[in-house]
Each structure stands twice: as C-alpha cells, then as structure tokens.
C-alpha cells in the first residue's frame, strides 16, 4: 500500500512539474522574430521581409522592407512596375486561442524606389526620382490602411519558429514564416 501511494505521489509530482513548465502561446511568442511573406494588393505581388519584436507587456514594434511588383498600362504601353517599400509599425498585440491580433498605434511607410520595365523582355524603361517619387509614395500610402487591426491564425508553433496564415486584400491566403532572432 505504501509503495502504491509513493507511485501515485510521484506521478502527481511529475504532472504538476510538466504543467508548470508549459508556456502559454503568448509566452512562446515573446521575443524578436524575423519573417518572410508574400501577399497581394490590387493585383500586385508584394514580397515582404522584416523583423517584429513582441514584448511581454503586450506591445510590439516592427520594421520591414518589401518589393511590390505589378503590371499596368501607361499611354497604351504595357509596363511592369517594381517598387521598394520601407515600413515601420508599433502597437499592441494579443493572443486569442490560436490567433494573433495586432492593433497598430503608429505606422510609417516610404516608397524607396519605383522603376518601370518592359514586361516582354525585362528591359529597364525608367524610374521616378525626387519630387515624383515623393508624390507616388504619398499616393501609395493613402491606398494602404496600415492602422487597421490584423489577425493571423497560428498554423504551427515551435520554440524557435512559427507559421501563420491570414487573408490579404484580394482574398488570398498569406502564409508567413517567423524564425526567432532572440
């Protein structure tokens, strides 16, 4: 009888130890993460690479660079436009079950370059510089709604990596892969 009691006590102690070691989803996401993702806006493809820092107090900050590629027609000529974008954002984040909800409190976007190419052979046609680039940047930023809350569903979560899924402006799924930096 005494031996059975010791075994039960040992099992209970192990179970208590295991549950004490389990981290919440939010605790696992605290830290700095490097990520890559591809999304679309108005038919253009955007490849994003950035770093987010999720803090224990529920705030976050992030920086990212993106390359947006889209096709249009200018004066009857088909062109491919490649645009470099630099972004900064900060705000609050929470975890609801298996979703990360980010609510920005500040954001900034700058178009760093805008180049035009011939889509048939990839040859360079021209680029915007100076005032033209600033004006194009302002128009692009107005089209974005970066102060809108976003939700990412967690598909996979490991100690040093996680994968999320969300829906972009064109209704397509965005899969982002995050790798722990620290």
Model region roles, listed by residue range:
Residues 21-182:
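Lipid interaction determinants
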Residues 1-20:
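Sec-dependent bacterial lipoprotein signal peptides
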């Amino acid at each position: 009888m005494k031996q059975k009691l010791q075994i039960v006590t040992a099992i209970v102690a192990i179970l208590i130890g295991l549950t004490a070691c389990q981290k919440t989803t939010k605790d696992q996401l605290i830290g700095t993460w490097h990520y890559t993702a591809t999304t679309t806006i108005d038919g253009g493809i955007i490849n994003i690479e950035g770093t987010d820092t999720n803090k224990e107090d529920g705030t976050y900050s992030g920086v990212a660079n993106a390359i947006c590629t889209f096709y249009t027609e200018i004066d009857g000529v088909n062109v491919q436009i490649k645009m470099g974008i630099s972004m900064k954002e900060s705000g609050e984040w929470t975890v609801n079950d298996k979703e990360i909800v980010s609510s920005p409190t500040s954001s900034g976007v700058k178009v760093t370059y805008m180049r035009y190419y011939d889509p048939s052979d990839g040859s360079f046609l021209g680029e915007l510089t100076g005032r033209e680039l600033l004006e194009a940047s302002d128009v692009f930023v107005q089209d974005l709604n970066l102060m809108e809350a976003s939700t990412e569903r967690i598909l996979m979560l490991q100690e040093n990596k996680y994968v999320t899924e969300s829906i972009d402006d064109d209704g397509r799924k965005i899969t982002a892969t995050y790798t722990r930096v620290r």
